[in-house]
Design a protein with these regions (language model features):
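Residue-level preference for short coil/turn positions at secondary-structure junctions
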Residues: 1-2, 82, 126, 158
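Helix-rich "cap/lid" substructures immediately adjacent to catalytic or cofactor-binding pockets
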Residues: 2-87, 164
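Short, electropositive, low-hydrophobicity segments enriched in small/polar residues
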Residues: 9, 14-16, 21, 92, ...
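Alpha/beta catalytic cores of group-transfer enzymes, especially the acyltransferase/condensing modules
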Residues: 11-12, 38-41, 100-182
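Surface-exposed loop/turn and secondary-structure junction residues enriched for glycine/proline
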Residues: 18-21, 25, 50-51, 58, ...
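Broad structural signal for hydrophobic residues in well-ordered alpha-helices, predominantly aliphatic
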Residues: 22, 36, 96, 144-145
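Gly/Ser-rich oxyanion-binding loop with an adjacent helix/lid
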Residues: 62-132
Length: 182
């Protein structure tokens, strides 16, 4: 068999019911959710039964995605599938660091719980929004952002996708400019 890499996603891949079947079928996955519930009560319930709106709240998204990604990984490891490499994007970087042993499971989970709380708290201070811009070059996105006092490229995700964030009052016009640019 060739090399195996585990790649972990960031916020945005959450969905209601995530991990429920995994937890019901594999005791090792259920034990991950139990560990998470012991630290942050209700995490598994949010994963399994939470609404789209609840899971969009960063304070919930971060712990729920971490728990689900760690649970899935625990099943693979239990079946003898071990990674030769790990990688992650944003939140996924913390999962990757945990899976490869930089953090133990509890420390990794506590970290993302705190991270989610802090991100949520800061986001609530201002009326902001963010979105991924696709099909424009980085130069085009930066040029459009520079037209606004409070709109910024915040993450160059991959070729052809750039996350932009700013005050909601300016983002509507920003989106119009993006649409006009292509």
């Amino acid at each position: 068999m060739g090399k195996i890499a585990f790649v972990f996603s960031g916020q945005g891949d959450q969905y209601p019911g995530m991990g429920k079947e995994l937890s019901e079928k594999y005791p090792v996955a259920a034990s991950v959710y139990a560990m998470c519930d012991g630290i942050r009560p209700g995490t598994s319930a949010q994963c399994f039964e939470g609404t789209v709106e609840e899971l969009k709240e960063t304070k919930n998204t971060q712990p729920c995605l971490f728990a689900t990604e760690l649970a899935a990984t625990s099943v693979l490891k239990d079946k003898g599938v071990l990674p030769d490499a790990v990688a992650g994007f944003s939140l996924g970087e913390v999962v990757a660091a945990t899976v490869c042993g930089i953090f133990d499971n509890e420390t990794g989970f506590r970290l993302v719980c705190k991270r989610g709380e802090l991100m949520q708290r800061e986001a609530e201070k201002f009326d902001t929004s963010m979105a991924a811009v696709v099909k424009l070059t980085p130069e085009q996105v930066v040029e459009i952002c520079e037209r606004y006092s409070d709109v910024y490229p915040v993450n160059f995700n991959c070729p052809g996708q750039i996350t932009v964030s700013g005050l909601s009052s300016q983002m509507t016009d920003f989106f119009s400019d993006v649409k006009a640019a292509g």
